[in-house]
Amino acid sequence: MLQLLKAFQQQGYAVVYASPAEESDHAVDLSQLNIRAERIELNNASFDTFIAQLNPQVVMFDRFMMEEQFSWRVEQHCPQAVRVLDSEDLHFLRHARHAALKAGITANQMPADEYLYSELAKREIAAILRCDITLTISEFEMTLLQRRFQIPADILHYCPFMLERGQADFELPEFSQRQHFVSIGNFRHEPNWDAVRYLKETLWPLIRRQLPAAQLHVYGAYPPKKATQLHNDKQGFLLKGWADDALRVVADARVLLAPLRFGAGLKGKLIDAALCHTPALTTTIGAEGLYRDSDDARQRAGYAAAGVNLADAALVADDPAEYARLAVELYQQQPQWQRASQAAAQVIDCRFSYARHQARLSDKLAQVSAQLQQHRLQNFYGSMLRHHSLKSSQYMSQWIEAKNRLKDIGG
């Protein structure tokens, strides 16, 4: 999100960040970034006054739930504003994979129809169709939306993480200076919590049997009591909780473990590993969208000439025994580790260049803004959904608003 806000600022927009959420303990101070922060309320007409007075040129919804809540109000009061949905990842895909895992189906990138075509999918796809542009974070999800849900390509825009090399602004340790394994991720995110339990119950015992002196340092915000109870010094399974500097702890580790069995989108922990030149070990789902070749022909040729293969940055295994074997090899064998570290060092420039993706986003916004009426006419199903389903969201919101008003009067 911060990368997108910065990109909008560089395009000349004055950015206002409006949220109904309570401020987190770890929230960024947006005022330091010259971004105005506003508190808004769900199901409250005060937003109508706020958005009408603001009269923005572009409105971006942070995931489909915010689109459901506020897009009808934006359309009513600022009909010429370009409506952008930041999908982050496809929620329905993550939930479909989770449901498949619970049913005993593992490591399946494309869940069966019974899991994929869910009520959640209907809501999220409807939000995508109602918006002028939806930002998708991985090519896999772009392809899924177009092939399985027939979403028009011109309302989708591939916009992954936008990063710059050197964000780890300290000297990165070499192989001999690093030790132990690291796992990192917010415990409130279900795929992360599942990965921690999978490590504790299945993978770490296999790894530790071969590396009895190794430790696994597990970091993440908001660890619940059931997570801290997994801490065991004797087993080398150490729950560390919140990391004050995530890049430092990833850089100090020799290998990052990310055994994600479900989820969607791009995995921030693997991006952190790339920023720190830390080799990683993940799963098919974990590696999704991260390590493909560059779409820049000159870059591809340069990496090929240098013998760099981006796929070396993270080894992939879905079988527990194979995962443990690769973890031990990557930890012990310096030549293999060096090859992986060198590949990781190229991932950011090759796949997630801030300059390249910021320019493409700017071009897409300019193109849609210049032809907004025609763009919307061509998205017939989107206009049909705005006509029908937004009315139901509108009336439900207005009903809740009226109910709350009556309760306040009665109270």
Say what each PLM segment does:
Residues 1-27:
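N-terminal subdomain of nucleotide-sugar transferases
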Residues 16-17, 147-151, 156-246, 251-252:
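Conserved catalytic-core segment of nucleotide-activated headgroup transferases in glycan assembly
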Residues 56-57, 132, 251-265, 276-278:
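Acidic donor-binding loop of glycosyltransferase active sites
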Residues 69-70, 118-153, 227:
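A short, active-site helix/loop in glycosyltransferases that binds the activated sugar's phosphate group
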Residues 80, 85-117:
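Acceptor-binding helix/loop patch of EC 2.4 sugar-transfer enzymes
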Residues 269-272, 279-286:
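Short hydrophobic beta-strand element within catalytic cores of glycosyltransferases
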Residues 297-306, 315-336:
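C-terminal "capping" alpha-helix adjacent to the active site of nucleotide-linked donor transferases
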Residues 336-338, 342-411:
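C-terminal amphipathic helix plus adjacent low-complexity
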